[in-house]
Every structure is written in structure tokens, then in C-alpha cells.
Amino acid sequence: TILMPPTDIPGVGRFAMIADPQGVPCYVMRGAVDAVSTAFAPDTPGHCQWNELATADQQAALAFYGGRFGWQPGDAVDMGELGDYRFLVQRGTTIGAVMNAPPGGPPPTWTFYFGVPDIDRAAQAIVSGGGTVHHGPAQVPGGSRIVVASDPQGASFGLVAPPATG
């Protein structure tokens, strides 16, 4: 479903807002120049490092995003009653994951995780800036540490940092 038609931003590119078949909204964009985007940079603080979709129908979401963007399902982690946490792979790079939305939880949505050097400091900055930390800081498989939060206006986001040292 097209929620906002394709729109040009001079010198930047063209974007639109869509909703997938489960109703989850997201923006899609093509840059003004034919180059690989640097918005997703798994090892660079301040950039998106993980894209996580909680959806009502994991298989339909995998088919939709795979068919539109070429994302391939990768390995999976068994999450018990929630099913698989299925990794998304684009050109050999794991860019995120798709999971079933928990029953009774928030509605299906994308959560984008941005890199920070220190998750504890980042969590403190969220709270002192008027935001809310909903989950974390918590360690995830692989050792990275995350928080899931919202800003003072209620927009949700995630942060991810390297494993704590010391």
C-alpha cells in the first residue's frame, strides 16, 4: 500500500512511504546518485546497525521484502513460543531480522537500532533528555548491548553498542 506517493528531494533522492501487507509502514528511498548508501554501517556509531521487524506474519513479510528488495532469509534463532528470529541478508551482509510480534504486545513495527559507543551513557542520555527506556540495557547473543526506547514525542528506536569491556 502506498501511504505517501514518491516524492523528489532535489539533490538527495526520491522517497515514498509504504505499508507492507501486514500494515507495517516504512519509507523507501533511492538516492540522487547511483551509489551504495552509507546509512547502514554496522560498525559505525551514529549509523543504523540493525533493522528489526516484528510482524503478524513472518513468512508473508519475508516474501514481501525479499521480492521487493532482494533480502534473503538467513539463519534463525529459536525463540520458543514466538517462533524463529530469522536474520535478513542483503548482498552477503546480515542487516537485521524478522520475528513474530508477541501476542498482546505493541503492534507490528520496524525498530531501527543506531550504533553508540557506550550503551549505559546512551540510556542515561535518553532519560535525562525526556525519553523513556522500555528495555535494557541488555546483552544480546553475540555480546552486543541494546536498549529499546522512545523519544519525548513517543517515536520508538533502538540503540546498540559493542560488548562492555573491563
Regions found by a protein language model. Give the residues of each.
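Short glycine-enriched loop/turn motifs at secondary-structure junctions
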Residues: 10, 44-47, 104-109, 141
